[in-house]
Amino acid sequence: MSDKILCDYCIKEITQNNYLAHVQKFHEENFLEIMKHIIQMNNDGYTTDEIAKKFNINESSVFKKLKDLSKNSNDIKEPLRISKWEPHDFKLEATTVWSFPDRGDWATHNGTYRGNWSPYIPRNIILRYSNEDDLVLDQFVGSGTTLVETKLLKRKGIGVDINPKAIEIAKNNVRFKKNNEYDPLIICGDARKLDFIDNNEVDLVCTHPPYANIIKYSDGIKGDLSLLDIDEFLEEIKNVAKEAIRVLKKGKYCVILIGDTRRHKHIIPLGFRVMDMFLEAGFVLKETIIKEQHNCKSTGFWYKRSIENNFLLIAHEYLFVFRKQ
């Protein structure tokens, strides 16, 4: 049951659920002033819960009003509805097999961006291989999962992606007010050409490259590695690895997630081929982690196909932890 509060303008007792509607109906000028402040706080990165507490009104009312307004105005950003800032009962992984059936729903994390990795992965990597105030680079930032974690964990973050749409999504996902002093730098650019980063400047590289010709992230953007065939992809990954080792400090770590693919019923060991590219660039391999996949189609159509055509469904990826000597 919604709590009752006194209207600031007519002293009438109103439920929190109906407060905004009441002010809009009976105190229009005051309503417009309240909405002006609510919109400003929303655009500044405050969550709907923080806004609701500020004005002592119902959170659902704030969310609904901002959601409706943002649909009709480019000047009003999507409301941030965040129920928690960290995972429940989190513990660092301690073995070389990682499994996260729960995708993770803290902060702005969600699984709507195709191919993004579980936030448990960068959280583990960042906590294990960096310290507060360190500089963390994601060369394929996508929807910004890594940078949400750098901001939450008080690291300085840099994210790069060649797709302007991804950049827009990433910027929206990190715009929350919490730890604002750790707002990351997000740049539309090429993972193979990080000219704006000096040699030996980065403390940790933490990234999830696209897979060759699996999920296409654009309709033909020049330099989009997801559009390449396997041989072309591997050739360009060499340049990604060279840039990673150039910008990384000595003794620091570069961690990438990559998986295999299948062509004509046979496995192509893309993961190990990518690993070789990073070793050739000068890295040494510290850890090989098997990351179990939970979004593979193990029932229905694909299960039937795997039996009929005698192949196994790929249900793992590789998390390679490299070190710069």
Residue ranges and their predicted role:
Residues S2-E13, N17-Q325:
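Class I S-adenosyl-L-methionine-dependent methyltransferase catalytic core
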